[in-house]
A protein has these predicted regions:
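Short glycine-biased active-site loop of nucleotidyltransferases that positions the nucleotide triphosphate
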Residues: 44-49, 65-70, 113-114
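Residues that flank catalytic or metal-binding motifs in active/ligand-binding sites
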Residues: 8, 41, 52, 73-75, ...
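Vicinal oxygen chelate
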Residues: 1-3, 91-120
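Aromatic/His-enriched, Gly/Pro-containing loop or helix-boundary segments
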Residues: 63-105
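Helix N-cap motif at beta-to-alpha junctions
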Residues: 18-19, 82-86, 119
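Core segments of cupin and vicinal oxygen chelate
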Residues: 6, 14-60
Length: 120
């Protein structure tokens, strides 16, 4: 059995410890637009006007710690910028914010910069 090729991922929710800190990263550094915010409990962010690509919430995680190494869970999320210029602009914001960068590579089909969000 194979999944229908028209299926896509509508959005992903991330449990974060602090909405303001998460928005400072996803909005101010990576460049996402805030589509809706529910105080300090949740924010829904998007690129291009979609209702939300990422949900950020503190419903079960306010003030929490990142999971310890060696545990299961989400490994990474790839955010594709449309071209090198736009990726470069995001990289410039990361550098200006002195955000730690874990690495970078050219996959042949895409170029990647690896980093961790405020919650690891």
């Amino acid at each position: 059995m194979s999944i229908d090729p028209r299926v896509d991922i509508g959005h992903v929710h991330l449990k974060v410890s602090d909405i303001d800190r998460a928005l400072a990263f996803y909005r101010d550094i990576l460049g996402f637009d805030v589509m809706q915010q529910m105080g300090d409990q949740a924010a829904f962010i998007s690129a291009g006007g979609y209702h939300h690509h990422l949900g950020l919430n503190t419903w079960e995680s306010r003030g929490g710690s990142p999971p310890p190494a060696g545990t299961t869970g989400l490994y990474h999320v790839a955010i594709r910028y449309p071209d090198r210029r736009t990726l470069g602009e995001a990289l410039r914001r990361l550098v200006d914010a002195e955000w730690p960068i874990d690495g970078a590579t050219d996959h042949g089909v895409s170029e990647a910069v690896y980093l961790r969000d405020p919650d690891g």
